[in-house]
C-alpha cells in the first residue's frame, strides 16, 4: 500500500468513527457526509476522494469497519471458548457493543430499501463468514454455505429483536441469541444424520463417470 493509500485508510476510519455517532441524528445522505467531514476537519466534499465509488462504498466500508471493531473486542475473550460460545460472543459484540441502537435502526432501514437489498445481503453474509472464521470453522464444502446460511438467519432476526429490547443490559437479546443458536445447532445435528446422495448414487450422473 502506498503512503497515500495508508493515509486514506486512516482518514476513512476517522470518517466511520464519526458516522457511528452522527447516524443517531441524521439519515444516510449528503447532510450526513457533510457533517462527518466537519467533525473530521476535512475539506468540503473530501469524502468524494476517500470514496470514489460513491454511497455503496461508504455503506459497505462502514459495515466492514464495524466487523473490524467486533474482531478487536473478541481478541479480549478467552481463547479456549467452545465454538457455540465464540459465536454467541461475536453476535453479542457485533449487535450490541459497536454502535448505538439508533444506528442499527438506520442501517436496517437502509438495507430494506429495494435498491440496497443486495448490498445488505452482501454485508450481512460477510459478517457471518467472519464470525464462523473467528469460531475456527475451516469447512470448504456444502457445510460452508449451510453454516453461514443458518447463522445469517440468526444474525438478522437478532438485530431486529434488539431494536425492541428495553431490558436491562439487553439481557433479552442475549437470551434470544442463545436460544436461536441452540435451534440451529439442533438443525445441524439432524443434517449430519442425513446421508446426502453421492454422484455414484444418481443414475444420470453415474453414466458420466
List where the protein language model places each region.
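C-terminal ligand-sensing/allosteric alpha-helical core of TetR-family HTH transcriptional regulators
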Residues: 83-97, 123, 127-134, 180
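Amphipathic C-terminal alpha-helical segment
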Residues: 155-168, 183-191
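Long, charge-rich low-complexity segments
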Residues: 189-209
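Amphipathic alpha-helical packing segments from all-alpha helical-bundle domains
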Residues: 115-137, 148-152
